[in-house]
């Protein structure tokens, strides 16, 4: 009988998130205003992605690690895919949305990480399990005291795009601080 061995990366997802993914995203985060200006100055979006972001394969969107600051103007917790709206103080976009859970949409945290790729997993299901575990680690880490309307915060996180970013921009956070 064939059995798929347990993939160690899935079992260690929270540890990988805390020790590698979140620190990598914070260390390489670019202020959104500067990032958007540099993307606009690039020859084309693919060139900008190569210089400023990360794309594991050409058929994937580009992932950017970003830092944004502003005032929380809305918090939506009615949906399981909760989000807050951040009115920006330092970027050409007027606002961004930041995922707050309890469920994150997408795989931005997994796909922006340069340390592992699909080839490190036994199959598509395990790669998906790893993405869910990474998202849950972020949600758990940020669950302490969620921001409220009127709070001024700084968010470090990841967003993906196929072209020059525009509103609404959805950021998956790795750190939220006052």
Regions found by a protein language model. Give the residues of each.
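OB-fold and OB-like single-stranded nucleic-acid-recognition modules
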Residues: 1-178
């Amino acid at each position: 009988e064939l059995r798929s061995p347990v993939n160690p990366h899935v079992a260690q997802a929270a540890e990988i998130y805390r020790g590698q993914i979140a620190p990598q995203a914070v260390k390489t985060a670019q202020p959104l205003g500067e990032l958007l200006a540099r993307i606009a100055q690039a020859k084309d979006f693919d060139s900008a992605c190569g210089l400023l972001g990360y794309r594991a394969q050409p058929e994937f969107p580009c992932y950017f690690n970003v830092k944004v600051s502003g005032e929380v103007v809305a918090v939506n917790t009615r949906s399981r895919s909760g989000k807050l709206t951040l009115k920006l103080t330092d970027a050409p976009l007027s606002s961004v949305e930041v995922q707050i859970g309890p469920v994150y949409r997408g795989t931005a945290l997994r796909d922006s990480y340069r340390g592992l790729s699909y080839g490190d997993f036994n199959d598509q299901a395990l790669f998906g399990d790893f993405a869910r575990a990474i998202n849950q680690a972020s949600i758990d880490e940020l669950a302490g005291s969620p921001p409220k309307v009127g709070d001024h915060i700084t968010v470090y996180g990841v967003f993906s795009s196929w072209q020059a970013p525009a509103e609404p921009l959805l950021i998956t956070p790795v750190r939220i601080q006052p």
